[in-house]
């Protein structure tokens, strides 16, 4: 077996990249309001707003009749069978509505019918080629 002489490759030179200047550490600050602050942990109500303004659950805000109405309306669909029936009826209604209105608006070919008259006789297309 003969030894194959391989050429000696020179040492690889590392790819040189241009040097980038070192970045300076910069302190980010926003000029907003007093003392140049966006967010003040010491004064949360003025920072985020007063959320307690909307959290009123007293009877004078929601009268008893309104609460009774929503309780009765949601009591009907609180059972699993009732909820499934509601979903099934809604799906059927959506399909029927699409069949009556949506298919015509989409100009589906099945709603238009045939656009051209066909040839009369047996195998008319084959005979016309002969």
From Swiss-Prot:
GO terms for cellular component: chloroplast thylakoid membrane; photosystem I reaction center. Possible role could be the docking of the LHC I antenna complex to the core complex. It holds the Pfam family PSI_PsaH. The keyword Thylakoid applies. It is found in: Plastid, Chloroplast thylakoid membrane. Residues 105-130 are annotated as: Disordered. It is a single-pass membrane protein. Its main location: plastid. Belongs to the psaH family. The chain crosses the membrane at residues 85-103. This is Photosystem I reaction center subunit VI, chloroplastic. GO terms for biological process: photosynthesis. Keywords: Chloroplast, Membrane, Photosynthesis, Photosystem I, Plastid, Thylakoid, Transit peptide, Transmembrane, Transmembrane helix. The keyword Transmembrane helix applies. Residues 1-30 form a transit peptide. InterPro entries: PSI_PsaH.
């Amino acid at each position: 077996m003969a030894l194959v002489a391989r050429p000696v490759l020179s040492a690889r030179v590392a790819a040189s990249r241009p040097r980038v200047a070192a970045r300076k550490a910069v302190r980010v600050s926003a000029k907003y309001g007093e003392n140049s602050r966006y967010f003040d942990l010491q004064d949360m109500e003025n920072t985020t707003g007063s959320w307690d303004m909307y959290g009123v659950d007293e009877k004078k805000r929601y009268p008893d009749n309104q609460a009774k109405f929503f309780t009765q309306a949601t009591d009907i669909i609180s059972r699993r069978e009732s909820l499934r029936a509601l979903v099934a009826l809604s799906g059927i209604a959506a399909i029927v509505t699409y069949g009556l209105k949506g298919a015509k608006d989409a100009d589906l070919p099945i709603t238009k019918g045939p656009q051209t008259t066909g040839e009369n006789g047996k195998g008319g297309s084959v005979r016309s080629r002969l």
